[in-house]
């Protein structure tokens, strides 16, 4: 399965369009993604992947991958190709509007003259 979406909400302020392509492997064991930030350079970007509070993330030694361990079920490995990642705090709002602390994976970097392309994947382990 392939999903493609774009968002132009940053175009007025930053002159930027965010396009995301997501591909699911037939067996469901891997998700590949590509984020294209299309626009002029001169800015930095942050791509944020917010995690559910029941998922604990740990950055691995290569600084480009994180181990994602849910309370139950199989773990996953998030890998960003050619980019370092970081973990930051986030907030999760459930259906009852209760706020819970959680984590987010952040991919960051500078925009080139025509934007940036970030490739990533989630692999079941």
What do the PLM-derived regions correspond to, one by one?
Residues 1-125:
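CBM-like, beta-strand-rich accessory domains located in the C-terminal region of large
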